[in-house]
Amino acid sequence: MTPALKEWSAAVHALLDGRQTVLLRKGGIGEKRFEVAAHEFLLFPTVAHSHAERVRPEHRDLLGPAAADSTDECVLLRAAAKVVAALPVNRPEGLDAIEDLHIWTAESVRADRLDFRPKHRLAVLVVSAIPLAEPVRLARTPEYGGCTSWVQLPVTPTLAAPVH
């Protein structure tokens, strides 16, 4: 089994396209807080919490292609990631300084990351994105559902060269 971090499909595409180099995490509703359970992992594409207004206009071209990677029937794995650094956010006002490292609007970061579960600290994961040599299609099963950050997948795909 291989660990996979659930991440919005548009962010996975942004990582592979070199437009994003960080992941902003607090943990799912079913978790007390986010833990870096693995430093190398697959990226499991999701769209459950996606809305076009959460992405800055210059990155909205990712939404169409990304939506096809996570359907009711299957998911298409395209990427893995390696954590280069995991940094707790102590000063939320400092998030403006990393705006060019992700695709989210400032309002989305505030509402979906900072204001969500305000007692929990936001983690910024600096990652190296690694495309899979060949995308892997998996049937969607109940084990992949729920509001958790991590799932275990029954695949060990071959990786290509890192994007960044």
List the model feature ranges, each with a label.
Residues 1-164:
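Structured alpha/beta reader/binder surfaces that contact nucleic acids or chromatin modification marks
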